[in-house]
Amino acid sequence: MADKNNSQPDVNEQIKVRMDKLAALQEAGKDPFQITKYDVTHHTDEIRAIYEAHEKELLGDRPAVNTDGMDEQQARESVNADYNERRAIMDASPIEVSFAGRMMFKRVMGKASFCNIADLKGRMQAYISRDAIGDDAYADFKKSDIGDIFGIKGFIFRTKTGEISVHAEEITLLSKSLQVLPEKFHGITDTDMRYRQRYVDLIMNPEVKDTFVKRSQIIKEIRRFLDGRDFMEVETPTLVSNAGGAAARPFETHYNALDEDVKLRISLELYLKRLIVGGLERVYEIGRVYRNEGVDTRHNPEFTLMELYQAYTDYEGMMELTESMFRHLAQTVCGTTEITYNGTKIDLGKPFRRLTMNDAIKEYAGVDFDTIKTDEEAKALAKERGIEFEERHTKGDIINLFFEEYCEEKLIQPTFIMDHPLAISPLTKKKPSDPEKVERFELFINTWEMCNAYSELNDPIDQRERFAQQDKNAENGDEEAQHTDEDFLNALAVGMPPTGGIGYGIDRLVMLLTDSPAIRDVLLFPTMKSLDGVNKKNDVNNTASEAPEKNVKTESEKIDFSKVKVEPLFEEDVDFDTFSKSDFRAVKVKECVAVPKSKKLLQFTLDDGTGTDRTILSGIHAYYEPEELVGKTLIAITNLPPRAMMGIDSCGMLLSAVHEEEGEEKLHLLMVDDHIPAGAKLY
């Protein structure tokens, strides 16, 4: 039963009631799950369109009734008379329809009821009367629940309030919903549920459904555009022995039938180039790739990539194709080439700006790398500017780090960044005029890299030398280095024509064109950390088919601390006055994301009880993924001075427990009872 703090019945009780209703239907021989099909003649948007057209045909330009000079009763009578006349004309030639969908609203009024039915195209009101469908059917309808799926046959009419509706003559329960739908999604916890239970999200939020309909349209228009340029769509292997074509860590697995270790592809590149060698002059593939990396607002380990290759052109040709395609997508999908993302207008109709990487750094950082000749000079400059680098890094790597630090965040309007350093582009053709640079570009929009394109390297000798350097990088600890691919080198030795190639992140493109804030908002089922407990048994939280057991006690886990090593305690005392100046507070994690271009840092948005969000950065990404920390209650020191990290001010420090175990450092973020409110002070 409902308590004083909750007017809604207990969810488990509601589920039991629904189960009882289903049992009663089955006992009466009305099991909805025995129905195998239903004849749908129209979707809801079509019903509206055909009725409006029919109405215009029969009523023409009949003016609305003029009630000027009438008193309230006269006006009401006049309006009713006009409605009845219109209704009589329309009902004389009724349009019969049959549609189906999920019931999202129901209002029972004695012998008649209204309900809203949602299908793929929208919602439609249905008028259900006992006289029209019969006593038994109406009695069953009154017992129905929100979430049930119905088929409705009847004729279209317009209500007195002006809403186009369907007057039901026959209703059929097609599926009984045994789970209780939420009223709406809101807050952090529900955001997590939206991603985990996307099927519920699609039911409750029409704008989410619209996003994924638009995603499908975007991919369809990409294919239409490329088909118009005589490209051929192909499919290449997902499981590969050598995951090349990009700088990323692969997922690894074992192929039992062949007894071989294989990897999931991180790119589509090398197989598509083999097809260019084979004489397929224009090829593309849209497919899933997998990179064993972090999760944040713009990255998901499994994502959709589109790569295309065109023989007898170069990166200039790829720029023209990219600019034309983006313009085509904006116009066909959004209806305009001037789009808005997060309140910022982005003009895809104007010619895209073109800027070399060195010129961009010169413009935004005031450094001219064309005058810097050695790796040592570049490293010294990086130290001077406080840019972190690894000892193995070359001048080319430092140039890239400078670009990421100073330039990316400035690139809002479409900009081609061209002519990258050779060191970071192992599959790209050198510029004839400057062998330290390559014919490569990246398109940046809204600070994001939208695509990456090359004049493809087709010299097998040069390619072998670059693979050798990548192998050395791997030996020196570069986990993202590519490895020598002998079969690909053999393909190049057969002969590959001059070729332009490009890769597009489809998910990021969809984010841009749908104004979606995070990559998870454009992935139907994004990667999520598994929940403890029930989900580990392949269940979803509290399912209707099997009610959860309550108050089940589990035996405490026995922990072996015999191999644990901790730092010695401090010998120096701290007086109470000094200690009391440290402000320890409970904080709630509102958001948590990986910091771009950092493998260690997580950025926390915290509720510290003041009403103003607090940002704290913590180098714990090796131990936690961002999504598992959202909603947790942590402990922070809040009165430390702000400290800039990766260009972000970190205002405080989160407390963690650190120890060593078998030579490996272990870390546990200090999490406390969620009943502790944000801002509670620790003593």
Regions found by a protein language model. Give the residues of each.
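Intrinsic disorder at enzyme termini
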Residues: A2-D31, D532-D577
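Metal-assisted phosphate- and nucleotidyl-transfer catalytic regions
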Residues: G244-P250, H328-T447, Q469-M496, K536
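Active-site pocket scaffolds in enzymes
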Residues: P460-D539
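Phosphate-backbone binding interfaces of nucleic-acid-interacting proteins
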Residues: A544-Y683
